[in-house]
Amino acid sequence: MTWTFTSDLTAYLAAAGPAVAAQPVSNTTLLTVADALERRGIAAYGSDAPFFGWWTGADGTVAGGLLCTPPFPLLLSAVPEEAVRELGAALATEPLLAGLHGINARRADAEALADAWGRPTRYAEEIRLYRLAGLLPPDPAPAGGARLAAEADLPLLVEWIDAFNAEADVPGSASEAVLRDRISYGGILLWEHEGAPVSLASFNRPIGSAARVGPVYTPPALRGRGYAAGVTHAVSEAAYASGASEVLLFTDLANPTSNGVYLRLGYTPVEDRAEVVPA
């Protein structure tokens, strides 16, 4: 039983790709990040080199993986308990794991790794993964309607994504190339009221059977009017129409309002994850 670490994306995909893809719901973020690195290049998330790893069990079968695109946290897939223990030990010995900015894993795994890290840690974020069990219309229906974002909307999209990132403490700024890509497949919707955009929602290209909604953003002055529910309903329909059989999203557990909105739209909890960072 062992972890193998590498900076070679091709080697990671060959070794860990099938195991990670076998659980497309739980491993949604690892799948979308690896897809972006394949399509947009190894520097898709910044100039620091990403690294990867996979867990091989006692029977010689690969049973999970990890990846990290600094300065973002290490992402750990669903893995057996013994893999978490061994990864905790590797935090002190594996050069590629030195200088981690954080670890994002299923809640119990994040707790175990925080204990094993050998340094003070704190929880930077606690999130819940939801899957859409059956789409329900927002009640009451918000005023206005949805439309696809277009190239002419880019300045607004950049402004709103940057505002979302600042609120969510996400590193980096909006990428026009990424936004253009999402526009190209109908992956960004705007909710309009009286001819003006009031809310935004997006989804990634379906990978395997799953697409993930996010981000969803409404400017602070326009919140509390149901616009986020309206645009999330519309983008969920669009994700299904794009070919996904599973539509997913993450929420911040510290935000009961958004969690309530998604539950009322028909999303159901799958699992909780946490991001631990050096204190």
Which stretches of residues belong to each language-model region?
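Short amphipathic alpha-helix that is part of the acyltransferase structural core
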Residues: M1-L30, L135-P171
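Conserved donor-binding loop and adjoining core beta-sheet/short helix segment
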Residues: W3-L9, P24, L31-E94, V198-A211
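Conserved acetyl-CoA-binding loop-helix of GNAT-fold acetyltransferases
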Residues: E81-L91, G214-P220, G224-A241, N259-R264
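Conserved GNAT acetyl-CoA-binding A-motif
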Residues: L97-R106, S209, A239-T251
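Conserved beta-strand-loop-alpha-helix junction that forms the acyl-donor binding cleft
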Residues: N104-A110, L249-N259, V276-A279
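Conserved acetyl-CoA-binding loop of GNAT-fold acetyltransferases
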Residues: G118-A124, L263-D272
